[in-house]
Structure formats: C-alpha cells, structure tokens
C-alpha cells in the first residue's frame, strides 16, 4: 500500500519505518530540510533501539523515502498519516495549528480518494476539525480516521511491530477495510488486537490510557512517602499489591516522578478539555500535584543530608533522560533537580549513556558531563541515581565508594538493595524505603 506520513519526528519516523518493514511503500515528509537530508543519509535524530537499522534497511530496499515535498507525497498515497507535533499551550491545551495546517495542505493536493489518519495525540473532536479543514480545500472523496499511538520510548519498534492493541476510530466502511488491511501484518499473532470504534472514543482512549498510567505512578509515589513515615518498604508493598490480579505489577515502581513527551502533556490536555466542558477532573489534578512534588523529593533528600548551603560540595548524578533507553530530556525529573542543586551552590557532575547532548542543550556548561559513571562519582559528596539504565544496575560498588568523598547514595529508582548497600559502606537512601 502507498502511505504518506506527514511529520518525521518520533512518532512519524517510527510509524513510517515499521510500515515500510511490512512491505508498504512509505514516504515520510518533514518541512525541516536539514532533518530530511540527514534521514536520507540514515542519520537518525533520536535514539530509539532498532530504529536506525530499520530505516537503513528499508531505504536501501526502496520502500522508505524522505522528502520535503508534501504535495507529491499526498498525491502518491492511499493513506495519509498526520504525525506532526501538538505542543501544549500555556493553559495546557493541545496546540492544533500544525495538525490543521497539514490537513488543509492534504486537501489542496488530493487527487483521488484518500484515508486521512490522525496519528498525533490530539483531543477529542480533532478528527472533525481535520475533516472540515480537508473539505474546505477539495471535492475529492476522503475519510478521516483516528489511530492513536501507544509507543513507549525505548521500546517503540517492539510496540509497533507487536502491539498489545491497535485502536482505530472510523466512521467509513471503506476506510475501515483499508486500515484493517494496513495493520493486518502486525496483528497476526492472534487475538482481537485491532479495536475498531467510533472516532471520539479512539481520541479519548489515548488520553485515558496515559492518564491511567500517570495515576498509577503518582499513587505509588505517594505510597512511597507514606511508607517512609511509617517505617515500611514500598518495594514490599509494591509486590504485595501487584500480586493481586485485579491490580497487576505494571507501573507500580516509585521514583522521582514521571516525565517525557507524553504523560505531562496529555494529563494537562485532558484536564483542560474537561475544564472547558465544565467538568473538573479532580483525580488527575491530584496526580499532577503529586508528580510536581515528587520531582523535588531527591533534591530535598540531598539537602537533608548535605545541608541547605551546598557551596563547595560536589554532587554526582547517574542518569539524565526521563527514563532508560532514550535520550529524551523533556520534562525529565533531573531538570528541576539540577536547577535546584545549582541554586544551592553545588557543583554538578553527570553521566548518561545517551542524553548528554540533550542535557547540554538545556544546561550548557553549568554542569560537568562525564564519559563514564565512575567519573561522575569521583570526588562527589553524594551520588544520585535518577535513571534506571542497565549500566548503573551492578557497577563496581567498592570502586564507587572509594571514589566518593562521602559515600552518600540517594537511589531515586530503588535499583539497589538497602541492606547490601549499607554492608558495602554506603549511606543509602531510596524512595519509600524507611531505614527506621
């Protein structure tokens, strides 16, 4: 099938590469000429495991091309995905100007029947706005679908190729058949993995899914703080409640708060949409409040044990990205942590396997970027673990302890066993793991 993907950012690039992998002829479009030039040279602007070889392979085999020529891509396609950004406004609402501008451009270049698919994360009602924008520019027949993505950064290729489910909002039988054919190769492992539904429900599903996951994270982070007060270990509590099949163990890990490009933005957007309709989503507002407070927990622990004035003190940080297996620093809990440390006068030395360039764009030369974890620990008065990269899970702890000026280890991801760390000579403090 001939497919155009408008927007070659994270979602568009992954979708385009995976659709090409199953034999479709895919054209990925972006207005950024330099990005397109780099993609044509197989230079991937983001870190995502498995993406670079997939892009390279499909370009070499002629199924995947990159261009700035949106009109030509639209004319060549049967299905056109809109995968441009929807950045949040100051009030938390999703900015649809790029989505609707692309929709109008699609309409102006429509030469036969097309299926126009919103892949971007958009609020309920957007598909109707897209339909109106396209209709203003063409008399050609077309259908509009909603096909939200459910990709986890760091596992996006696996998520797309072997999805838990594919949600498709559609109100046209021909479009339903086209989308079913397009996704058939990804759902042959059995089960009813393609969920066709009305468009509004598909649009809500994306926001509801991310809001639920964010809620679980904030719930466990609040339980972690409670555990510290009563002398319990949140890890034991996590195992105890996660063993209940009604609850399950996914997304029950306490930490420094959620971040990234999805959860913060999507929770704000659904709250804003509901507020505009006269409904206050009080649970999700509490989820946001808990998360903002949680982002300060590691900083507060550092100040508690090192003092309010950190002038002359060095703090090592392992992990900058908001999660492992990505270079994404958007809304990372490490950002307010580092800003807080700098405000108190600390010298900050950091390490991350992939996110150093992203961090440098934020902090410039105000922090030190180390080539390996041990350099970040060298001479530090405290070591803070902020991202659950594999490289941090089992280092040479004796070497780390000797490198530290003071063996203060604040484990923001609960990677380590408290008793073992204490036996190794560390002053260990986790999240929700009382040492009383």
Predicted regions and their residues:
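Structural/interface elements that position substrates and couple domains in central-metabolism enzymes
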Residues: 1-436
């Amino acid at each position: 099938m001939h497919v155009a993907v408008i927007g070659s950012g994270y979602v568009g690039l992954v979708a385009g590469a995976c659709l090409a992998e199953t034999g479709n002829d895919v054209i990925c479009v972006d207005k950024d000429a330099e990005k397109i030039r780099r993609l044509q040279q197989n230079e991937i602007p983001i870190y995502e495991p498995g993406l670079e070889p997939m892009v390279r392979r499909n370009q070499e085999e002629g199924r995947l091309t990159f261009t700035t020529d949106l009109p030509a891509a639209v004319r060549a396609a049967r299905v056109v995905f809109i995968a441009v950004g929807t950045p949040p406004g100051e009030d938390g609402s999703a900015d649809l100007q790029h989505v609707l501008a692309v929709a109008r451009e699609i309409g102006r270049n429509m030469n036969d029947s097309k299926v126009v698919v919103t892949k971007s994360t958009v609020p309920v009602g957007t598909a109707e706005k897209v339909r109106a924008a396209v209709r203003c520019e063409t008399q050609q027949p077309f259908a509009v679908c909603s096909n939200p993505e459910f990709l986890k950064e760091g596992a996006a290729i696996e998520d797309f190729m072997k999805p838990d489910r594919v949600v498709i909002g559609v109100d046209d039988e021909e479009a339903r058949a086209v989308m079913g054919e397009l996704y058939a190769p990804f759902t042959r492992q059995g089960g009813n993995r393609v969920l066709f539904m009305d468009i509004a429900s598909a649009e809500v599903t994306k926001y509801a899914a991310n809001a639920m996951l964010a809620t679980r994270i904030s719930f466990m982070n609040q339980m972690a703080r409670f555990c510290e007060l009563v002398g319990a270990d949140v890890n034991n509590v996590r195992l105890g409640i996660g063993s209940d099949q009604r609850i399950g163990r996914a997304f029950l890990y306490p930490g420094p708060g959620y971040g990234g490009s999805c959860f913060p933005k999507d929770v704000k957007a659904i709250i804003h949409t509901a507020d505009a309709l006269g409904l206050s989503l009080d649970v999700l507002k509490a989820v946001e409040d808990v998360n903002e407070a949680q982002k300060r927990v590691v900083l507060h622990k550092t100040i508690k044990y090192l003092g309010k004035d950190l002038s002359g003190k060095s703090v090592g940080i392992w992990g900058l990205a908001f999660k492992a297996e990505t270079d994404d620093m958007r809304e990372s809990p490490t950002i307010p942590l580092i800003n807080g440390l700098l405000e108190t006068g600390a010298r900050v030395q950091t390490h991350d396997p992939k996110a150093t360039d992203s961090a440098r764009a934020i902090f410039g030369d105000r922090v030190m970027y180390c080539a390996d974890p041990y350099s970040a620990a060298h001479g530090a008065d405290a070591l803070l673990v902020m991202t659950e990269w594999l490289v941090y899970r089992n280092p040479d702890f004796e070497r780390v302890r000797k490198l530290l000026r003071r063996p203060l280890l604040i484990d923001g991801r609960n990677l380590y066993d408290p008793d073992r760390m204490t036996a190794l000579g560390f002053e260990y403090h986790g999240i929700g793991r009382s040492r009383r």
